[in-house]
From Swiss-Prot:
Residues 1-23 form the signal peptide. GO terms for molecular function: cytokine activity; type I interferon receptor binding. Gene3D superfamilies: 1.20.1250.10. It is found in: Secreted. Keywords: Antiviral defense, Cytokine, Disulfide bond, Secreted, Signal. Disulfide bonds join C24-C122, C52-C162. The keyword Disulfide bond applies. It comes from Bos taurus. One of its GO terms (biological process) is humoral immune response. Belongs to the alpha/beta interferon family. This is Interferon omega-1. It comes from the Eukaryota. The keyword Secreted applies.
Length: 195
């Protein structure tokens, strides 16, 4: 979790360096939806993590993603977008619906989609000619590989209930870190606009 928090802190630092704000305002609703997504993930718990200790795994979030000097504003938003997109894809899988309460799952997918729409607007403002290359940059590619490892883990574990519980906890940690930082981002943006 520390490495995910470090990555997201790097995203905020880059966004609020000497150049100022991101150039896009995340709505207050964006943060509220993020909190709701976390509550939904908490409610989706079906097993005690104690029963799944043998299935624990370090998903090896890449440390090189926390190098602030490597990030530009568009890359930072792109990485955050990739995290939400991959989370959406993960829970949108056909096999995911067997593991969760379908009402909670649908609400989570709707919330993730709303957050992605907000970030799509930011990406549109921040990207120009570099748009096509963003998905191939180191940080975004590393995020894709991180989630690919999660997909492989689920396959290897036969999409078992314990495997899904471990993944739910991992995604909950990641989204928790991103939600906290998005709240700070909104507060900092408000401070920058104050007289």
């Amino acid at each position: 979790m520390a490495f995910v928090l470090s990555l997201l802190m790097a995203l905020v630092l880059v966004s609020y360096g000497p150049g100022g704000s991101l150039g896009c305002d995340l709505s207050p609703n964006h943060v509220l939806v993020g909190r709701q997504n976390l509550r939904l993930l908490g409610q989706m718990r079906r097993l005690s993590p104690r029963f799944c200790l043998q299935d624990r795994k370090d998903f090896a979030f890449p440390q090189e993603m926390v190098e602030v000097s490597q990030f530009q504003e568009a890359q930072a938003i792109s990485v955050l977008h990739e995290m939400l997109q991959q989370s959406f894809n993960l829970f949108h899988k056909e096999r995911s619906s067997a593991a969760w309460d379908t009402t909670l799952l649908e609400q989570l997918l709707t919330g993730l989609h709303q957050q992605l729409d907000d970030l799509d607007a930011c990406l549109g403002l921040l990207t120009g000619e570099e748009d096509s290359a963003l998905g191939r940059t180191g940080p975004t590619l590393a995020m894709k590989r991180y989630f690919q490892g999660i997909h492989v883990y689920l396959q290897e574990k036969g999409y078992s209930d314990c495997a899904w519980e471990i993944v739910r906890l991992e995604i909950m940690r990641s989204l928790s870190s991103s939600t906290s930082l998005q709240e700070r981002l909104r507060m900092m943006d408000g401070d920058l606009k104050s007289p």
